[in-house]
Structure formats: C-alpha cells, structure tokens
C-alpha cells in the first residue's frame, strides 16, 4: 500500500539547486486542521493521521543541492519540512514552530529526513508538538516493502536549539 499525501504549501520535485532563503515567514495557518484532527480523535479515539489527512508546509523531493536558510516556518498543519529522496541538503538557521497549547499541533515534526544523503541541519531552533528531527526510510507505514525506499546516509545535526518537542531525534515509524 502506498500512502498518499496532500500537496504541501510549498512543493519542489526534481528541482536541483532549489533554495529558500531570507528573513521571511512561511505560515501554514494550521489551527483549523489541528482542531479538526482533535475533534475527530474525540469522536473516534483510534483515529490516525491516515484518517484525518493534513498538508505539510514544505516538501522537497528527488532533488540535489537544496538549501533552506534563515526563514521562519510555523504553524504547519502536519509535518513542517519533509525532504524525500534528496542529496546534498542544507537546512541552516531555521526557526521552526508549532504550538503545544492551547490547541496541540499533532504530528507537526520540524524536519523529516526521508531516504536522503549528505544532509546538514545547523543552527536551527525547533519547537513543535512532535519530533524535532525524524529520520525515515520512505513513505507510509509499509515503507520497508517498497523498492523505491531506503536509508538515510551522512546526516549531520549540529548547534541546534530545542524548545518543546517530543524528541530531539527520532527514527520515525517509517524507518527501516
């Protein structure tokens, strides 16, 4: 089974040299999505992310030489930064935030590194209601069965600061 995702607010597929830089803010305005998720969870306690789909904030896939630097990424409806099947990635001086109160931002991982090589995460501030950095081995709960998925290699995370989060580094549920 392959897991389908909503398009992210910002998407880049097969864009070598993709760059976002500056002092701006990308705001996902996730409050409506979070409220909807928790309402559904209240009615159906076993509801999962697959039952209440939400968009990511930034998704980059199948790309080389990507740099995201200096921006604020906040209030993502779902994962904030999802990097999939990419090589030579720099995530520098980012401020990533999603609230834990008054409405929790469910599964608002700051950075998901997914089947990537040569990744540097440096001088980032992460405060989200889930994982700060999650290493994943492909998309979906059956990622280990899909031939297009694989491992992460040469990942460096340094000089980062963490606010509220469930973990600083997680080998995510899709890891193999």
Protein language model annotation of sequence segments:
Residues 1-176:
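Extracellular/periplasmic carbohydrate-active domains that bind, remodel
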């Amino acid at each position: 089974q392959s897991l389908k995702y909503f398009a992210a607010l910002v998407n880049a597929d097969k864009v070598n040299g993709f760059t976002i830089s500056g002092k701006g803010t990308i705001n996902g305005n996730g409050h409506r999505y979070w409220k909807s998720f928790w309402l559904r969870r209240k009615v159906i306690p076993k509801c999962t992310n697959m039952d209440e789909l939400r968009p990511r904030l930034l998704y980059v896939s199948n790309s080389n030489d990507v740099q995201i630097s200096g921006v604020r990424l906040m209030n993502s409806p779902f994962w904030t930064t999802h990097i999939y099947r990419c090589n030579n990635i720099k995530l520098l001086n980012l401020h990533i935030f999603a609230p834990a109160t008054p409405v929790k931002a469910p599964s608002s991982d700051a950075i998901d590194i997914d089947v990537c090589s040569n990744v540097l995460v440096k001088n980032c501030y992460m405060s989200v209601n889930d994982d700060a950095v999650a290493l994943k081995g492909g998309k979906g709960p059956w990622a280990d069965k899909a031939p297009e998925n694989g491992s992460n290699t040469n990942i460096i995370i340094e000089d980062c600061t963490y606010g509220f989060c469930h973990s600083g580094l997680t080998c995510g549920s899709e890891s193999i």
